[in-house]
Curated annotation (Swiss-Prot):
InterPro entries: eFR1_2_sf, eRF1_1_Pelota, eRF1_1_sf, eRF1_2, eRF1_3, Peptide_chain-rel_aRF1, Peptide_chain-rel_eRF1/aRF1, Ribosomal_eL30-like_sf
The species this protein was found in: Halorubrum lacusprofundi (strain ATCC 49239 / DSM 5036 / JCM 8891 / ACAM 34)
Classification via NCBIfam families: aRF1_eRF1
Localization of this protein: Cytoplasm
Its job: Directs the termination of nascent peptide synthesis (translation) in response to the termination codons UAA, UAG and UGA.
Pfam families in the cross-refs: eRF1_1, eRF1_2, eRF1_3
Assembly behavior: Heterodimer of two subunits, one of which binds GTP.
Name of this chain's protein: Peptide chain release factor subunit 1
A single Gene Ontology CC term: cytoplasm
Domain of life: Archaea
Family assignment from sequence similarity: Belongs to the eukaryotic release factor 1 family.
GO molecular function, one term: translation release factor activity, codon specific
Primary gene name: prf1
Keywords: Cytoplasm, Protein biosynthesis
Amino acid sequence: MSSDAQEASDDRRKYEFRKVIEELRDFEGSGTQLVTIYIPEDRQVSDVVAHVTQEHSEASNIKSKQTRTAVQDALTSIKDRLRYYDTFPPENGMVIFSGAIDAGGGQTDMVTRTLESPPQPVESFRYHCDSAFLTEPLEHMLEDSGLFGLIVLDRREANVGWLKGKRVEPVKSASSLVPGKQRKGGQSAQRFARLRLEAIDNFYQEVAGMADDLFVDKRHELDGILVGGPSPTKDEFLDGDYLHHELQDKVLGKFDVAYTDESGLKDLVDNASEALADQEIVEDKRHMDEFFENLHTGEEATYGFDQTRRNLIMGSVDRLLISEDLRSDVVVYECPNGHEEYEVVDSRHSTPSHECSECGEEADVDEREDVIEHLMSIAEQRGTDTKFISTDFEKGEQLLDAFGGIAGILRYSTGV
């Protein structure tokens, strides 16, 4: 499998995992009756079955009949699932969720989900029984890779934060007491200059303290530190060895940034694109910049479900751009006269009625599926790459808000 094909496969699998995790996270049990089991790849299935059998036996001591029955039913369902596996679980292990969830009106529904081969290996065996499924370890596996420290400063203010994968996270800020260059009456120029230099030095120490508090404990996980601001501020700060000595070697570079508030952290990431060339957020921005450039020429760009789908079917889409935050379904309607039409609806909403635009007849629902999976299936058949775009930068937000979360960069202009 080529690297692009492998990346597309990994992205799709991550999306499918994320979708299931979001569903599981919303489930609640009426008591402590939702069971989660994390199984590493080197744990023998027979050992897990023995553990589940033991838990089933111990559950007979639960006083509440409802909870006792629910827990034992969940464990029985898990044992049934484990019968489908040989000696060991799949690569990277697996996670099984089972339990009676609250369906409202005093009713419950029994659900069992199995997630095989997560993006990262399951580190240890874990049995968990609570009123909610344990999804946090899986959520951590899906976090974007790459961890960078961010510092922006001038002589008025400073902000410190993280770049985690595609997300810029402001964490700490400070305002300086550095006086302006004009001295107050009665002060000698020499005394004023000395006081000003002391204030600058104190402020740099404060900024370094914020950075040290945030970054030192994470220094072994850090991929680098980026420093931004106007000259000579950022130069003085770095040349003055204010940062902790173990952080100084992590500095990837200094970059000119016009703003030093929270928005300056995003500007810093933009301006450090060469240093971050292999990071996902830079790739996202490159795709969106190309999309907007093509859109402004009126040629090799498409957006929205209908136009993008038509171009996908034609095989003209080079890259399908999907917002990571898109949560919609596509409903396929068919009228009595055989006309087929599509409508995109929020995944949380019920299926609306539909009148055929061609003949006016009431149309029946033929199918409803996740809009991303629908489009990705066509893309795979046509050799189109799919890119998931973060909303943690302006053009990524625009993809979701202005274009419905769906767009494409075309191989050639189609007029569609």
